[in-house]
Amino acid sequence: NMSRLLEEKDALLTLLTLLSLSHGFYTRFGALQLLVLLVEHRRLEVQDYVLTAPGGSSSVLQCLEAAPSSSTEIIRNEALLLLPQLVRDNADIQKIVAFEGAFERLLDIIVQEGRIEGGVVVQDALDGLEALLLQNVSNQNYFRETLSIPLLGPLLFYPPPIPPQAPEHARQEYATHQRAFLLQEWDEQKLTNAQILLRCIRHLIDGQGD
């Protein structure tokens, strides 16, 4: 059935079109689920199509936008599952998705969901972030130049550094935040999120890619 679907010239275009905000929840959700299934089993063919289809990747990225406590969060969460698989081992799609604003959208989700304490949604967003950075020098440079590595520290709840000339009360407050960081509790999900985030930081520092 997948082969027959992919043989249809406009099948994938139709699926991507169904992700539009103009369609209802069930239509968008069903299209996303089918795309996840196709990417899981026929990833290379889907990637080739997305590279040539007008607005192919942007239709997926718009699914990452969600209003709090609404059905669009379900759409967003499904899109988070699709994104890492869609860009995997394909530097061209990784670059296109990054330049269309994926980094910013993923970081917004991570912050909105509670940073590393945010559960599995944060894990999925971090997986997407890592998939865009892994072995892609262009994306690593783009992230460093437009967003910067220090932006990731607060996601771990690590306090940002203070200037050397900071007044005493600021130093005391900084020390309090450092102690809070050291004494925070680490459950299994939080550890998983932190490990993925640290891997992202390592990719940016090492700068190894294609």
Q: Where are the language model's segments positioned?
A:
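Flexible, disordered linker segments and immediate boundary regions flanking tandem C2H2 zinc-finger modules
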Residues: 108-110, 154-157, 167
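Eukaryotic Ser/Thr/Pro-rich intrinsically disordered, low-complexity regulatory regions
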Residues: 177-180
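Elongated alpha-helical scaffolds that mediate protein-protein interactions in large eukaryotic proteins
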Residues: 1-16, 20-32, 37-61, 69-77, ...
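Active-site-proximal polar cores
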Residues: 198
